[in-house]
Swiss-Prot record:
Its main location: cytoplasm. Its EC number is 2.1.1.45. GO terms for biological process: dTMP biosynthetic process; dTTP biosynthetic process; methylation. It comes from Nitrosomonas europaea (strain ATCC 19718 / CIP 103999 / KCTC 2705 / NBRC 14298). Catalyzes the reductive methylation of 2'-deoxyuridine-5'-monophosphate (dUMP) to 2'-deoxythymidine-5'-monophosphate (dTMP) while utilizing 5,10-methylenetetrahydrofolate (mTHF) as the methyl donor and reductant in the reaction, yielding dihydrofolate (DHF) as a by-product. This enzymatic reaction provides an intracellular de novo source of dTMP, an essential precursor for DNA biosynthesis. It comes from the Bacteria. This is Thymidylate synthase. GO terms for molecular function: thymidylate synthase activity. Signal peptide: none annotated. PANTHER family: THYMIDYLATE SYNTHASE, THYMIDYLATE SYNTHASE 1. Belongs to the thymidylate synthase family. Bacterial-type ThyA subfamily.
Length: 264
């Protein structure tokens, strides 16, 4: 995954030193894009080991519309622990907005079901968009959405997805984001009888925290290995029927993990 390493290299070379909400400080660039052909392998970073179990369970948690970390804790996933309140609640974050967006007339919109219906019925539509950025709910969220909006595109029997991410923790978060939205694209493509196309990742503020710079440089010393393959249970045709056991990752041969502190 040279695209990811190129992003880190770009930020180390051209990044602006900035303060941030967490008080850690960052090297930051504004506006950057990566593209991944999902036909050539599953874009999971190989220059450090990624916790695939967390990636899959987090995505399933979003798709369930849940915003309490109980499901994650029961499945050994701790990536949201730092933000949850004493009851495990996170407020109306991703899962709520994806599945239960509250409209001004009092109706509730399931954006995931809606966008899948659009892909099936009007694949040339330019409105196949899911948004997590609900301005009226931001103050109720424990963490405002970083991956804000994604759009689907169908051409030549292939489904592509573009994500706009307003804020990107390059070292810790971005490998998860790439894999998560690529996996979501594979799942929706299967449910819509399409082949996977591209995952396009567009950033607003892409940054390396100042206490991640040495880890980033270590990762840049490692030569990327061949991408793994992600196999989905081909019998699943409803996006909400997928379970953890329906995913099998083949030929993942990463370098050892690199630890880094989370900026909260």
């Amino acid at each position: 995954m040279y695209q990811y390493l190129d992003l880190m290299r770009h930020v180390l070379q051209y990044g602006h030193k900035k303060s941030d909400r967490t008080g850690t400080g960052t090297l930051s660039v504004f506006g950057y894009q990566m593209r991944f052909d999902l036909q050539t392998g599953f874009p999971l970073v190989t220059t450090k080991k990624c916790h695939v179990k967390s990636i899959i369970h987090e995505l399933l948690w979003f798709l369930r519309g849940e915003t309490n970390i109980d499901y994650l804790k029961r499945n050994g996933v701790s990536i949201w622990d730092e933000w949850a309140d004493e009851n495990g609640d996170l407020g109306p974050i991703y899962g709520h907005q994806w599945r239960s967006w509250a409209a001004s007339d009092g109706t509730v919109i399931d954006q995931i079901s809606q966008v899948i219906q659009q892909i099936k019925e009007t694949p040339d539509s330019r409105r196949m968009i899911v948004s997590a950025w609900n301005v009226g709910d931001l103050d109720k969220m424990k963490l405002a959405p970083c991956h804000v909006l994604f759009q689907f595109y169908v051409a030549d029997g292939r489904l592509s997805c573009q994500l706009y991410q307003r804020s990107a923790d390059i070292f810790l978060g971005v490998p998860f984001n790439i894999a998560s939205y690529s996996l979501l694209t594979l799942m929706i493509a299967q449910c819509c009888d399409l082949q996977p196309g591209e995952f396009v990742h567009t950033f607003g503020d892409a940054h390396l925290y100042l206490n991640h710079l040495e880890q980033a440089r270590l990762q840049l010393e490692r030569e990327p290995r061949a991408l793994p393959a992600m196999q989905l249970n081909s019998t699943v045709r409803n996006i909400f029927d997928f379970g953890y056991e329906d995913f099998t990752l083949h030929d993942y041969d990463p370098y050892p993990p690199i630890k880094a502190p989370v900026a909260v």
